């Protein structure tokens, strides 16, 4: 299983669109793809036809788990109408995660451990990241094998790219 994060510390640069497009291309090639929506705005969740206010489970629930096994993680994954593509949806409660979780030990590795529990079920995981550095972004980057940084050729998007590269450098050192 290969894990990609689609990340930039700037909103509106095409992270969600890139995630869906890449997932679609991979599934057309016969790969099993899990998408993870880590943004409280839940654009990916909505794009895939779910109402983030009424989903039966969300990424927030994953952060409440005490153990990460296939049996505990798989129920949080929803099937999409698109063949070969599933999602762990977002919910607005993700916006409170930094405050709720505090400084718990191992906070940055929760998503990585959860994805390892379902690694036999998917060929690729695509993580649609929020535009801010916080618990969700750190978890996404720590879980990733590769990072795709969409950027537009305009000043603020380039500043977002600079911040993203600084963040990656800091994480790589720690």
Name every feature range the model reports, one short phrase each.
Residues 1-174:
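P-loop NTP-binding core
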